[in-house]
Amino acid sequence: MRISGHEFARMCDATLTGAVATHQEMLEMIKQAKKYHFYSVIGQRCYLDEMVEKLKGTDVLVGAGCSNITGADPAEVKANFAKWHLAHGAQEIENIMNISAFKSGLDDMVVRDVRAVRDAIGPNVVYKCILEVCYLNDDEIRHACELLIEGGVDYVKTSTGKAGPATLHHVEVMSEACKGRAKIKAAGGIRSIETVERMLDLGVERFGVG
């Protein structure tokens, strides 16, 4: 599937959440998001109010993550963070699957975790949840997609990009598992327009860049 630069930008969530990401880098991300019309930005929680203010009146949304990098926060903590973000102007929410619970076979805990955030934000807020596919084999990816769909997500997302890259194979497995019941966001290690176009053919609707 061939797309223009503008079409690709409107599928991109620009992300800047690293531990050493600076305030100046956040301002530059916002500048680039406005210039290229990215779909959304996700930054450090301490700058959320400022990001919301600077993007008022633009076509760029502000997203927010409600989990630490491991996904192992208690469900109530994630739910409260999600509500806090919405109260401060965030328009989309991202969670990270509880990878420890998943690897432990605690499927009910995984679903409760995902569902707690959905219940906290309501049915109309776009909600994404990250698998961290680099930690999972194909069967685990398929099973994780089922649990996240059961928990009420709009998007299953490959990765944070901090643990390892997302590959075409990962996306193919996710696409086969989701069967259109959830949308797919790809992030981490996507370096060429050819890869983007092949991922689009597999059903990816949003990309993380940062």
Task: Give the ranges of each region predicted by the language model.
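Alpha-helix-loop-beta-strand connector modules within alpha/beta enzyme cores
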Residues: 45-70, 105-128, 132-133, 150-151, ...
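Hydrophobic faces of well-ordered beta-strands that scaffold small-molecule active sites
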Residues: 8-16, 41-43, 60-67, 93-95, ...
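Glycine-rich phosphate-binding active-site loops on the catalytic face of alpha/beta enzymes
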Residues: 64-69, 87-102, 150-167, 186-210
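Conserved N-terminal beta1-alpha1 strand-loop-helix module at the mouth
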Residues: 1-64, 68-87, 142-143, 147-150
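Catalytic cores of alpha/beta
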Residues: 52, 73-84, 136-147, 169-186, ...
